[in-house]
Regions:
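Alpha/beta catalytic barrel-like cores
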Residues: 1-129, 135-137
Length: 137
């Protein structure tokens, strides 16, 4: 692993940094190319601009390691809504999700059911669902 990658992964595991670093303007400007906003509306607006340039996009909801299954269900509901809104906007946008964001660390069977639900939604909308690689300690 590289030093930069190790630093980013270390920072991602620290709540205080996740909550406070985005408040700094230089941090927001540094990540804007990869994360053009904090809402689905921001992402759709950026994807629309990129579509005009012929560029496909990928959406992911930031976060992982939910602390209870109701949080995982909210994640699923948000992705389902995003699939519908992206299809309605006619965007060439695919989605990726982290298994721990669907509750893998809490209940593997519930996480699998959540994953199957999202895969079904992706198929209904003629789209894709990509799984992000996560740490395997």
């Amino acid at each position: 692993m590289t030093l930069a990658r190790d630093a980013v992964l270390w920072a991602a595991d620290h709540r205080w940094l996740r909550e406070h670093l985005p408040k700094y303007r230089f941090v927001r400007r540094s990540v804007r190319r990869f994360m053009p906003g904090e809402t689905l509306e921001d992402a759709i607006a950026a994807a629309t601009r990129l579509r005009e340039r012929g560029l496909p996009t990928m959406f992911t909801a930031l976060g992982e390691n939910v602390t209870d299954l109701s949080d995982a269900r909210r994640v699923v509901a948000n992705y389902r809504d995003a699939y519908d809104r992206v299809a309605d906007a006619g965007l060439d946008t695919e989605f990726s999700v982290k298994p721990s964001h669907l509750g893998l660390d809490l209940d593997p069977e519930a996480a699998l059911a959540n994953l199957e639900e999202l895969a079904t939604k992706a198929a209904e909308r003629d789209n894709w669902l990509w799984l992000d690689m996560e740490s395997a300690d």
